[in-house]
């Protein structure tokens, strides 16, 4: 009787980007942001995420996103071309809820201005958006001395993001 063994493969990738490529990519991203801001184009899903990564995490976040999506696309193509598909399977992609930027900014603004006594209900009613903001490092319930008594506060990164995006829309 044959035994079936499953292997899960994971690996790290180090991507190096020359300053010339970085300058070109940064110029292209600024051009894309201006076009989207002026309404000249409506970005597709990939372009939207590139803009978010660029504005939130800078070139490092953008490069991480580009490398990750490139590898995912290459692996999907490899899977389609692979002859023995029964022995090569992919797990489903992690799907996260998509939020409107205005809703996201409202949550950041509310956490920034909401009295600590009202935060519990607000956080409970907007749990998915609060979780998204926390995962991006824009809010935190931790301080340097430990837990903040269960109260959420906007981080310096969250404040910069709010200012960059023009506050609550």
UniProtKB/Swiss-Prot annotation:
One of its GO terms (biological process) is viral translational frameshifting. InterPro entries: Phage_T7_5.5. It is believed that a second protein is produced by a -1 frameshift during the translation of gene 5.5. This frameshift may occur anywhere within the region corresponding to residues 85-99 of the sequence shown. Thus a portion of these residues may be replaced by a portion of the segment GLFQTISCNSTGGVL in the actual gene 5.5-5.7 protein. This is Fusion protein 5.5/5.7. It comes from Escherichia phage T7.
């Amino acid at each position: 009787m044959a035994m079936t063994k499953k292997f899960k493969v994971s690996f790290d990738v180090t991507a190096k980007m020359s300053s010339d490529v970085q300058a070109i990519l940064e110029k292209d991203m600024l051009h894309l942001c201006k076009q989207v801001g002026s309404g000249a184009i409506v970005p597709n899903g990939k372009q939207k995420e590139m803009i978010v990564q660029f504005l939130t995490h800078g070139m490092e976040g953008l490069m991480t996103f580009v490398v990750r999506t490139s590898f995912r696309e290459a692996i999907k193509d490899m899977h389609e071309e692979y002859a023995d598909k029964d022995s090569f399977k992919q797990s489903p992609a992690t799907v996260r809820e998509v939020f409107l930027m205005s809703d996201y900014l409202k949550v950041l603004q509310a956490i920034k201005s909401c009295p600590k006594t009202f935060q519990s209900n607000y956080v409970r009613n907007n749990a998915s958006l609060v979780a998204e903001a926390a995962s991006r490092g824009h809010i935190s319930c931790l301080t340097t001395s430990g837990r903040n008594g269960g109260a959420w506060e906007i981080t310096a990164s969250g404040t910069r993001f709010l200012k960059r995006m023009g506050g609550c829309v």
